[in-house]
Amino acid sequence: MQRLRFSSFTWILLSLFGLISCRPEPPIEPVEPAEVAPLTDAEQVIADALDGMVVPISSTPFDITDTDLQVLDYLADTKIVGLGEATHGTREFFQMKHRVFQYLVEQHGFDAFLFEMDFAEAMLFDRWIQGEIEGDLRSMMRDEMLFWTWKTDAVEDLYTWMRDYNRANPDKRIHLYGVDTQSPNYSLKELLRRLELIMPTTADSVRFYIGSDYERMLDLYNSKDQIAADRIQNSLEEVRKVIEEAKNAIIRSSSEEAYAWIERLVTHMEQVEAHSYQYFVLGQGPLRDKYMADNTRWLSDQMPEGSQVALWAHNYHVSNTFTGNLFNDSQGGYLRQRYQDDYQIIGFGMNTGRFTAFNRGTLKTNTIPTVANRSSYNYLFSHMQNKNFILRFDQVTSSDADAWLRRAKPFLSLGAVYQAPASNYYYPIILTSMYDVLIYFDNTGSTLLIR
């Protein structure tokens, strides 16, 4: 299996964004929270009310029963369910997303898991899930995955479960798809692989026009090389012409569906270029979320009518954040605008514990020993009797609790990079505006990365 190759600068760049794989020490016992001040009387009333409305769950996601998850049965007919994560390195979040997806598949017939991973990168792993290729999954993840965030035992367990499910249910197969647009490497390789199978001469034409600049894009764009950018943009225009001119021949040699996927790979290459140019050359906000939403829509449309999918991404990406500003709107915001209530959002929260993230350039297990923000949602949740729970906001019947949830408050949110103090990572949001459901674990452990 050919490994993806990145230049030295690209590896440095990916490291800064927390994307290189290595392995922290294994998760250890839960963090012992430091003593914190009690709630006020008014806050205690809210905490008590919420305790009566949440579904208590185990701190171990795979011990959570189907009965516990019946609170999510209202999602039975939902087209897309977003599953967030408050950090990119929390084991309970990853395992819980597996558990929820398993429930949605087994109880409600969901068809696919869309991932915050490269569009074409996911195709390789879906072929493994479908049984089309063999090989050791752990080795594939170590060698072929770009982001360290997904190179975990929890994701390995999820993909293994999906493959096992397909073996047991060949007439109701589930799929893995990617929606992200950060790497120039995967889509070109996948485009050429597909063309080689049905139209080798068209593959040769793509190679002729694309040259070597496209795969070196991140290096060239980081150096603000406008001449190279012009070459890359022109080459992509030529590649699109080649594919469109070969459309009828591709369909005759294969199918309309095959052409649709080939054309979409070209679209994805264009997305990666536009996002990279906007971000690195122009220094403007990223276009990722807009494109991730568009890829989610396209993938959903490609599936049979009535298909349902879950979406794995960070809390921010799945959230309903839509202002009309291209650079501030989230993937979930675009999806809510398009699908309205047919897109439902499950956010994740935590109080204390360990998580994996880059800290001063080193990928390591980090610790939050106590809630840092007295006015945060997390602070009150940490004082509830039920330490781990599922809360549907549409089932909040207490007026005091409802009003409290609808007021903007800080909420802990980490990505792939962390540097203490934790108070730097609390952002004011309105929980009920951004999410429909909250899954909360009071004390968490870090992900276990694959070497």
PLM region spans:
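Bacterial N-terminal signal peptides that target proteins for export
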Residues: 2-10
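Bacterial N-terminal signal peptides
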Residues: 10-19
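Structured catalytic-domain cores with a bias toward divalent-metal coordination
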Residues: 22-451
